[in-house]
Amino acid sequence: MTEQEHLALAMERAKIRLRQGIGTQSERLVHSTLKYYLEPDESCHEIPIGSYVADIFQKETGQIIEIQTKGFDRLRDKLDYFLKDYHVTVVHPIVREKYLCWVDPETGEVVSRRKSPRKGRATDILPEIYRLPKLQNHPNLSFAALLMDVEEFRLLDGWNIDKKRGSHRMERYPTAIDSIVRVDAPSDFAALLPELPMEFTRKDLAKAIKLSATTTAYAVRVWERAGSIVQIGKSGRQYLYKRSN
C-alpha cells in the first residue's frame, strides 16, 4: 500500500466513524484521519488512562500518542499524569500546502479554488511547545511536526463584499502527508534551526523561519531551553545569539 493509499483509507475510516457519531463531540475529520493514519488498529484509539483519555495508546509498547492542532497548554495536566508512567509523543499537524475551495451557500457549488500562499514549516510547532516550559525537556516526552497538504472548503458567507472575511469553514480534507519531523530529545531541537550567520538576531531568525516577531520570540525561548542557542550580547537594541557548541 502506498502512502497515498494509506492516507485515503485512513480518511474513509474516519468519515465512517464520524458519521456513526463515534468519538468526541468536537472531533474533526483531520484529527480522526490522523488517528487512523498513525495507528490503524481502532482498539488502540481513545483509551481511558486514569481520569484522562489518550488519543492513541499502543498497549504492547506502552506508548501514547496525542494529536494536538493548537493549544498545547491545554495538555499540561494530561501530560503531567501520563508522563509518570508512559512515553508520550505529541503530534502537531501543520498545513504545508493548502488549496482553498469556496462554496456557494445556496447551491453548494464550488465556485472557485486557489492555492494559499502560506506554507507551513516544521518550525511552526515551536510557539506551541513554548506553552510547555516545565515539560519541554522531559525524558518521556517527544514531539512530532506532521506536515500535510489539505483542501479546505469554506462557505461564501462572510461580511465583506466578496463574502470571504468572517466566512465559515466547512471542513478540511488531508490530501497528502509530506513528512514527519520528530524531536525525541533536547538535542534534536537544533536540527530545526535554519541556515544563519555565526551571530544572529531575532530579526534574522524571523526572516528565515517566516514567523512574526512575537512568535519568533517564543521559538527563541524554546531553542534556549533546549540548549540549541545562547545569547551572547547585543547589536544595537537587538539581542545577539549563536548556536551552542
Where are these regions (language model features)?
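Short, cationic-aromatic polyanion-contact patches
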Residues: 234-245
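Short acidic, hydrophobic short linear motifs in intrinsically disordered regions
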Residues: 196-208
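A short, conserved structural fragment
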Residues: 224-235
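Long, low-complexity, charged/polar intrinsically disordered regions in eukaryotic proteins
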Residues: 111-181
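Acidic-basic catalytic patches of nuclease active cores, encompassing PD-(D/E)XK
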Residues: 1-52
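Conserved catalytic cores of phosphodiester-cleaving nucleases, focusing on short active-site segments
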Residues: 34, 54-71, 75, 82
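Short amphipathic alpha-helical interaction segments
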Residues: 211-224
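A basic- and aromatic-enriched beta-loop-alpha substructure that forms the phosphate/nucleotide-
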Residues: 77-139
